[in-house]
């Protein structure tokens, strides 16, 4: 299985054994680390590109504002046009005490500014003809569409982990930790490593305890050799070659990593990680015949801490943790990043779907916005409103307990109770339809939606009564 994942030339290099040193002896092991470096460096996740400020979403919000009641619209006129939410709340503390519109305030002000002037750019482009239905008639459907679009727009926000962290930043952080450790520090822009500073001893830097700390660390230890035959490339590593006993060269890492072959530009992060780990699993121990240690590369004298040894000894990581290659710290970090990548892909797909649905909702809203007076509601808009109401109130009928239920047998037991003295079928206590809060609406007995400030039941039941009008 692992062989099938590897290019034939790379596999041949990895499996090449032999007891005699030769130029490029360390290259098979170096190719493994370069593949891991490519995954951790060149496959970082780009910043989230999904734009929550979709023009279609803005149109939905503007339509909702342009047909809102005059009392709601004028809240955002005058001094409010320039005020932050905290300034507005302070200036109107008595009138709006207990209300918090901080999350939506700036957007609402923007919508009012864009729709206030009948001759403005947005109103000119989206002019409602004189024969269109009245704002009061179209508010319920457009409001339902705006609510649905608001819910969908949340899927356009940058994804987060289960504990609330920025998902992309977390993936890239795992990759960064896999790249550098110990004597190597993250480079500017967090795209590589720098170091080592000074000239640390290889004997104390490249111990089995420190092996696997990062991909860069293992590259440094593998390729910092004085022997001419133990090279990570056919041309050597230049100024990274130790030149004083067991001392590593200052800032030698940049000369080592520069010898890595360029990885493929195509492919995903999981594909790059899978290839690197398959190469690692195949290469471990193959160049060290007779050794029970899990060594990557070839030891010159039974150890990987000398400058005549081109290897990394992972024996301690295998023997202590009993976790296979996942006991190697940088391997574990790559696998963690890979696991998070699945959540990232799901979020991208959800955002793409949400964007498409918002575009469709904008089309429905525009048809309703221009619906002729006296005509039937746009079927798509009706379906949208019904779907929203089902989500809000459940699929139950709110008028099950009516005067038509003349007898106890006709009175539904699930939601109603029969009063034998008055011969009435009425809702059970606790099941009556009530206002439920900001963003949710009730329908009065006359069947007309509450669309103005003065007739809204939410005014009487919640300090956030206005918030239901615009989402």
Swiss-Prot record:
Lipid bilayer topology: Lipid-anchor; GPI-anchor
Pfam families recorded: VSG_B (PF13206)
Q: Which residues are glycosylated?
A: 64, 405, 450
Bias category Basic and acidic residues: which stretches?
412-431
| Coarse class of the protein's main subcellular location | membrane
Q: Propeptide residue ranges?
A: 455-471
Lipid (GPI-anchor amidated serine) attached at which positions?
Answer: 454
Keyword set includes Cytoplasm: no
Name listed for the protein in its UniProt record: Variant surface glycoprotein ILTAT 1.21
Q: Which organism is it from?
A: Trypanosoma brucei brucei
Tell me the classification of the organism that encodes this protein.
Answer: Eukaryota, Discoba, Euglenozoa, Kinetoplastea, Metakinetoplastina
């Amino acid at each position: 299985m692992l062989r099938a994942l590897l290019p034939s030339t790379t596999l041949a290099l990895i499996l090449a054994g032999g007891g005699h040193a030769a130029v490029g002896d360390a290259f098979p092991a170096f190719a493994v680390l370069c593949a891991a470096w490519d995954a951790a460096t060149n496959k970082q996740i780009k910043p989230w590109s999904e734009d929550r400020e979709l023009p279609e979403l803005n149109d939905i919000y503007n339509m909702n504002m342009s047909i809102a009641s005059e009392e709601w619209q004028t809240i955002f006129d005058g001094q409010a046009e320039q005020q932050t939410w905290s300034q507005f709340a302070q200036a109107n503390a008595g009138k709006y005490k207990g209300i918090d519109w901080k999350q939506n305030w700036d957007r609402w002000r923007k919508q009012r500014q864009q729709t206030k002037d009948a001759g403005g750019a947005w109103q000119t482009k989206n002019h409602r003809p004189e024969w269109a239905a009245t704002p009061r008639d179209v508010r319920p459907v457009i409001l339902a569409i705006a609510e649905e679009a608001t819910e969908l727009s949340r899927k356009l926000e940058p994804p987060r982990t289960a504990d609330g962290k920025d998902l992309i930043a977390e993936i890239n952080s795992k990759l960064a930790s896999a790249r550098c450790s110990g004597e190597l520090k993250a480079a500017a822009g967090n795209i590589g490593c720098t170091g080592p500073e000074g000239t640390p001893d290889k004997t104390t830097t490249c111990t089995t305890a420190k092996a696997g700390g990062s991909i860069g660390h293992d590259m440094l230890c593998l390729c910092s050799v004085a022997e001419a035959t133990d090279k990570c490339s056919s041309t050597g590593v230049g100024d990274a070659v130790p030149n004083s006993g067991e001392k590593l060269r200052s800032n030698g890492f940049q000369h080592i990593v520069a010898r890595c072959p360029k990885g493929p530009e195509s492919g995903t992060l999981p594909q790059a990680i899978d290839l690197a780990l398959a190469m690692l699993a195949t290469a471990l121990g193959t160049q060290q015949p007779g050794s029970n240690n899990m060594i990557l590369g070839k030891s010159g004298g039974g150890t990987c801490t000398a400058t005549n040894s081109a290897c990394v000894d992972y024996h301690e990581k295998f023997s202590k943790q009993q976790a296979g290659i996942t006991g190697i710290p940088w391997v574990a970090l790559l696998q963690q990043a890979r696991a998070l990548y699945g959540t990232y892909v799901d979020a991208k797909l959800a955002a793409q779907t949400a964007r498409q649905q918002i575009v469709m909702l904008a089309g429905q809203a525009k048809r309703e916005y221009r619906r002729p007076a006296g005509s039937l509601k746009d079927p798509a808009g009706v379906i949208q409103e019904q779907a929203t109401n089902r989500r809000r109130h459940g699929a139950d009928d709110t008028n099950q307990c009516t005067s038509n239920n003349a007898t106890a047998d006709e009175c539904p037991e699930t939601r109603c109770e029969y009063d034998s003295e008055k011969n009435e079928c009425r809702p059970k206590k606790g099941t009556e339809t009530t206002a439920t809060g900001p963003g949710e609406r009730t329908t009065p007995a006359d069947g007309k939606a509450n669309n103005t400030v003065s007739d809204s039941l939410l005014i009487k039941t919640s300090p956030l009564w206005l918030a239901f009008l615009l989402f």
